[in-house]
C-alpha cells in the first residue's frame, strides 16, 4: 500500500482524504514547517501534500520513496522543480484554486482603498466620531 503525508493541518480534511484513498493509500498528517520536519516525517512517503512547505532539492533528495508532490494551492514556487524533475517526481497543483475568492478580495480592497475606507475607519476608531 502507498503512503501519503499531508504536511499541514486543515479542519476535517484528513478524514475526507483517508476515506477517498482507503485501501489504496495510507494518509497521515504531520505539520511540517521546516526542511528537517519534512525529512523526519516523510522519510517513507510515496506522496506528500503541501501548501507552502519548503520542498527544496535537499528535501526532495532526502526522501527516497517520493513519487508525487501534490501542491494544494495555485502556486508551487516552494517546490524545487528541477530537483523533482531530475528524480522523475510528478508535481501537481490546483490551477484555479481560490481564484474567484482572491479576485473578489482584491476587487474589494481596491474599492476600499479608492474610497479611503481604511483611513476613515482608523479615524473613527481613534477619534470616536464620524465627521466627513
Give a label for each model feature.
Residues 41-47, 64-67:
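Short acidic/histidine-rich motifs immediately flanking catalytic phosphotransfer sites
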Residues 50-51, 67-73, 93:
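Short beta-strand elements of ligand-binding domains
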Residues 54-67, 80-83:
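Rossmann-fold NAD(P) dinucleotide-binding segment
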Residues 77-89:
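Rossmann-fold NAD(P)-binding glycine/threonine-rich loop
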Amino acid at each position: 500500500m502507498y503512503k501519503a503525508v499531508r504536511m499541514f493541518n486543515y479542519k476535517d480534511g484528513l478524514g475526507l482524504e483517508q476515506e477517498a484513498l482507503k485501501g489504496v493509500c495510507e494518509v497521515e498528517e504531520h505539520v511540517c514547517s521546516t526542511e528537517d520536519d519534512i525529512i523526519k516525517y516523510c522519510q517513507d512517503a510515496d506522496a506528500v501534500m503541501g501548501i507552502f512547505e519548503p520542498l527544496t532539492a535537499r528535501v526532495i533528495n532526502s526522501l527516497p520513496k517520493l513519487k508525487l508532490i501534490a501542491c494544494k494551492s495555485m502556486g508551487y514556487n516552494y517546490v524545487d522543480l528541477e530537483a523533482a524533475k531530475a528524480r522523475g517526481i510528478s508535481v501537481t497543483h490546483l490551477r484555479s484554486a481560490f481564484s474567484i475568492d482572491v479576485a473578489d478580495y482584491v476587487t474589494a480592497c481596491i474599492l476600499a482603498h479608492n474610497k479611503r475606507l481604511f483611513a476613515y475607519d482608523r479615524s473613527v476608531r481613534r477619534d470616536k466620531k464620524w465627521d466627513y
